[in-house]
Amino acid sequence: MSLTINSNIAATRASKYLASNHQNLQKSLDRLSSGRRITEPADDAGGLAVSMKLENEINQLEGAANNIANAISFLQVQDGILENISNIVMRLGELKSMSDDVLQDGSTIYDSEVADLSTQLDTYTTATNNTFNGVNLLDSTSNLTVTAGSQSITISRHDIATALTSGDNNSDDFTNLTLVGNITSADDVNEILEQVAELRATNGGEANQLQYAMADVSTQITNLTAAKGRIMDVDIAAESANLARQQILVQASAAMVAQANAANNVALTLLQ
């Protein structure tokens, strides 16, 4: 092998390996510091494309989960109102029973409370009096539709005014009572309670449907997140071993560059 000054092939090759090893070391540091296997498209273009699609699906499902959570809260508030209505109607029935006591000297002592309770019931029939984030809780004109992933779920906004009437042709209106005597019989109370109970049953069924939808969406989010992680996340143990290897290679190649440069000093010795 000839000895030259202008060309140092050994040093050139060692420098090339040093640059390559240093680049690999930098890549390993990037992966460990970010926790990602893919830090730029060149690492795995196909994997990056798949992970972006998965992330988009996850984001959409998380939005659906928020929609479902809000719908569940809506139903919980709605049921609270229906429960209050049930309690008021039961109290009216109690007042009716007490007014029928033959030992009572008249029923007028209950009239004031009956009128007050009836007025409270009447407030529930006005949709704008009962809202959740600006949305009417009780509105017979329309229902709501919640998008839960791939399915749509209907949320009922009940006709509470009709539920608070009983008797033939809905002649007994519990939102317009002024006297305990306006309550025809205990059967009227029972009829209205049954009607309100049906509304609460519908509310509960819709809430259960939303809970199942939430569980389904949560499962999808978990599975998609795991799939994305398998593509994007770095194996810390394996990458740590690779980092140690690259550090040794960088040190070794740097030492070889120095050795290759020193080898040409022999030519100077010959020229002396």
Model-derived regions: residue spans:
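A short, polar/charged loop-to-alpha-helix boundary motif
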Residues: S240-A244
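N-terminal glycine-rich anion-binding loops that anchor highly charged ligand groups
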Residues: N24-L25
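Amphipathic alpha-helical coiled-coil/heptad-repeat segments
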Residues: S2-T12, A19, S33, R37-P41, ...
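Short alpha-helical H-box segment flanking the phosphoacceptor histidine in two-component systems
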Residues: D235, I248, A252
